[in-house]
Design a protein with these regions (language model features):
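C-terminal hydrophobic helical "lid"/dimerization subdomain
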Residues: 2-3, 240, 284, 288-336
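A short acidic, Gly/Pro-enriched loop at the edge of an enzyme's catalytic core
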Residues: 221-229
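N-terminal glycine-rich cofactor-binding segment
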Residues: 9-27, 44-72, 100-114
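Mid-domain Rossmann-like dinucleotide-binding core that forms the NAD(H)/NADP(H) cofactor-binding site
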Residues: 135-216
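Glycine-rich beta-strand-centered segment in the early N-terminal region that forms part
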Residues: 25-40, 53-93, 132-135
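N-terminal Rossmann-like NAD(P) cofactor-binding module of classical short-chain dehydrogenase/reductase
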Residues: 82, 230, 253
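NAD(P)H dinucleotide-binding glycine-rich loop of Rossmann-like/cofactor-binding domains
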Residues: 89-172
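Glycine-rich phosphate-binding loop and adjacent beta-alpha segment
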Residues: 236-296, 334-336
Length: 336
């Protein structure tokens, strides 16, 4: 790791501290590669930490795991990359099945080791994914959340009783994951409804997805109406809404984890043979597919991204916390 650099440290709930001469005491691994971070996104899980609701992310940590960087030295010096932040063992039954997201012996960038809210970061070589040097750095930084979306949509496809293009689909939430989900479904020709309580995000859904977003706090959502429901929020209320709105024989894919516990209508799930499918992150195949989809325009032009300098990280978190940030994704620039 670089001796001194600019970095943002999560120092306490609702407190992100910009440090001009941060010194890392992290012990790097032999196979770690040093990256100069060009762009890094703020994830919903970073917001959970910011709110003090993620016991896995403690004060003193550099958050951030959605990134684009440039290799600093070695034979690939200057090459642009992103990376899978899940550092897995590579030898357990799940890793050998290609389901490395389920590896129980895993570390994670921005959780168990320092993340990308900094000018530099190290990452194991096995996690690197090379990208075209001409590709937009902000778009590359969206690969990680897009990979979660690819995984979620693939699960919906695998568990639906008819082709996804024929499935009337409900997307709950129009944050980054929800918006990207709607955009990918749009590329498949899916007829959908998008729910979002933050009215500031409604114009973005209209402009980029081409559907009018609905505020479920102001408008009732039909019961037993959707073939597929993808919950990108994961609160107790949206969990209940997912089950009530899905058709008999339909599929619910749960992506969001706003609430750590939930009560669901197990009677409906059983009597109407509803498939409830959990979705945790992605595997490396999903990750690489997401990069390809971003590059070929399957997620649209991504012009809705909001860019801010790393020094304004605390302000970015506050605006997301207060609901005043209209954009579904803020990208921080460490070398602004």
């Amino acid at each position: 790791m670089i001796d001194k650099m600019q970095a943002v440290v999560y120092t306490a709930p609702q407190e992100m501290t910009f440090i001009n001469d941060y010194h890392s005491n992290q012990v790097d691994r032999d196979d770690d590669v040093l990256l100069r971070i060009q762009a890094v996104g703020i994830c919903g899980s970073d917001m959970h930490a910011y709110h003090g609701k993620d016991p896995r992310r403690n004060p003193g940590l550099i958050l951030g795991h959605e990134f684009c960087g440039e290799i600093v030295d070695g034979p690939d010096k200057g090459k642009k990359v992103t990376g899978n932040p899940l550092i897995t063992c590579g030898k357990c039954e799940y890793c050998l099945q290609g389901r490395d997201n389920l590896c129980s012996d895993r570390d994670m960038i921005g959780m168990s080791r320092q993340g990308a809210f900094a000018q530099y970061m190290t990452i194991p070589k096995q996690c690197l994914v090379h990208t075209p040097n001409t590709m937009n750095s902000n778009h590359i930084a969206l690969t990680e959340p897009a990979a979660t979306v690819v995984h979620a949509v693939n699960l919906a496809i695998e568990n639906s009783f008819k082709p996804i293009s024929e499935c009337h689909t409900l997307v709950i939430g129009a944050g980054a994951i929800g918006l990207l989900t709607a955009l990918l479904l749009k590329s498949y020709g899916v007829k959908m409804k998008v729910l979002e309580t933050n009215l500031a995000r409604h114009p973005c859904v209209q402009d980029h997805v081409g559907v009018k977003a609905v505020n479920p706090l102001a408008e009732a959502i039909d019961e037993n109406a959707f073939d597929v429901v993808i919950d990108c929020v994961g609160s107790e209320k949206t969990n209940a809404l997912s089950i009530s709105s899905v058709k008999a024989g339909g599929t619910v894919v749960n992506v969001g984890l706003l609430s750590w516990t939930s009560s669901i209508d197990i009677r409906k799930i059983t009597l109407q043979e509803v498939k409830l499918v959990g979705c945790y992150t992605y595997n490396m195949e999903d990750f690489k597919s997401a990069l390809t989809f971003i590059e070929n325009g399957s997620f649209g032009d991504l012009s809705w991204i909001e860019e801010m300098p790393l020094s304004e990280t605390d302000a970015a978190f506050k605006s997301l916390h207060n609901g005043t940030m209209a954009s579904a994704k803020v990208i921080l620039k460490p070398h602004f």
